[in-house]
């Protein structure tokens, strides 16, 4: 059976390893998962209370248009319901966008170190992928702008960026958008929007009134603590959302997921507390790094990236201590956990870097 030639160059997405997978390698003890940027505190208690009442609905198909959820999102964001598209996580929405917009021979432009699904789906659609290196961990919009051409159908901007946690500020993003043709779709992936505390972070939704080629993505998987429910959404011009809905699978968001997301979206107190605790957790890591001269990227997310050597060694050390982190070729990404979990990881990092310094001194004195 023949499939697309380009699939031979791709691999299925590999998420962070589960505790069960880790036990097969590192033994049967407990593991703390800090690899996939989930909320360690779970979701709003309102969600749990309400879902207890919903078990009898499961024999019925969900609302295919996610009407209540979309209206809830629209009301809070001050847009029309027709401007909102819901999907089974942002992964599905990225797939929908790629399938709807891209043709063989087109190209997309994005960063070299960013969420890999932009590249993945472009290749499936037979497109060229132009990847621009980050500048000190941040999207280099000037360089991205310089390679956009008539065949560029999508520019993907992950802001804040995954895996570095860095962000493009309001001035730079606005300037970039002004310089891009309206024939090119600019997708701004704001999966970590709720965690942002920077005063100059862009408010992108007002830009939709002026620019027809902008699509903003957000999710319930991170701050809202609903990763297993798989709910993400896009906000854009009505005409574009209407076309994307043609590609969307019917009944793509389950009834439980719709109800959970609708309830969670109304619990601002929960989000405020999550952001407060997350900010304290980031400060734990940043203080440790500064005190020990360990490089890191200041983060506007619920994770921190350390651009260090020997990521595999650090991953192994954390794994043996019961912590699952995410290694990269040029560093490690650690999800912010509870205070105690953060302290545990920091203790492992402290030991690793002390051993590294000791080994370096021994080699110099040999």
For each predicted feature, which ranges?
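N-terminal small-domain helix-loop-helix segment of the aminotransferase-like
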Residues: 2-89, 96, 366
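Active-site pre-lysine segment of PLP-dependent enzymes
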Residues: 123, 141-150, 163-186, 192-221
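PLP-dependent aminotransferase class I/II
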Residues: 65, 213-290, 294-297
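PLP-dependent enzyme catalytic core of the Aspartate aminotransferase-like
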Residues: 312, 317-321, 325-366
């Amino acid at each position: 059976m023949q499939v697309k030639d380009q699939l031979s160059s791709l691999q299925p997405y590999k998420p962070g390893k589960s505790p069960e997978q880790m036990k097969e390698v590192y033994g049967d003890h407990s593991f703390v998962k800090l690899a996939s940027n989930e909320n360690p505190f779970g979701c709003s208690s309102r969600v749990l209370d309400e879902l207890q009442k919903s078990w009898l609905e499961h024999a019925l198909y969900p609302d295919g248009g996610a009407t209540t959820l979309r209206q809830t999102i629209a009301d809070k964001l001050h847009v029309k319901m027709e401007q909102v598209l819901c999907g089974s996580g942002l992964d599905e929405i990225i797939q929908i966008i790629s399938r709807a917009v891209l043709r063989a021979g087109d190209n997309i432009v994005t960063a070299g170190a960013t969420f890999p699904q932009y590249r993945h789906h472009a290749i499936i659609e037979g497109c060229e992928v132009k990847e621009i290196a980050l500048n000190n961990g941040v999207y280099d919009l000037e360089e991205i702008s310089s390679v956009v051409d008539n065949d560029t159908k999508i520019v993907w901007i992950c802001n804040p960026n995954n895996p570095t946690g860095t962000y493009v500020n309001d001035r730079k993003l606005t300037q970039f958008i002004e310089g891009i043709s309206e024939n090119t779709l600019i997708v701004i992936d704001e999966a970590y929007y709720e965690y942002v505390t920077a005063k100059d972070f862009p408010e992108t939704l007002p830009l939709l009134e002026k620019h027809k080629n902008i699509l903003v993505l957000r999710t319930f998987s991170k701050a809202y603590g609903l990763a297993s429910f798989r709910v993400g959404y896009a906000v854009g011009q009505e005409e574009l959302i209407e076309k994307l809905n043609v590609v969307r699978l019917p009944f793509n968001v389950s009834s439980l997921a719709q109800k959970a997301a609708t309830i969670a979206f109304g619990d601002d107190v929960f989000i405020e507390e999550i952001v407060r605790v997350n900010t304290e957790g980031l400060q734990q890591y940043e203080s440790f790094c500064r005190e020990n001269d360990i490089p890191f990227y200041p983060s506007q997310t619920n994770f921190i990236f350390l651009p260090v050597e020997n990521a595999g060694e650090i991953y192994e050390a954390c794994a043996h201590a019961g912590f699952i982190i995410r290694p990269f070729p040029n560093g490690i990404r650690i999800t912010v956990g509870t205070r105690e979990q953060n302290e545990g990881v920091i203790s492992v990092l402290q030991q690793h870097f002390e051993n590294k310094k000791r080994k370096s001194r021994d080699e110099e004195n040999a």
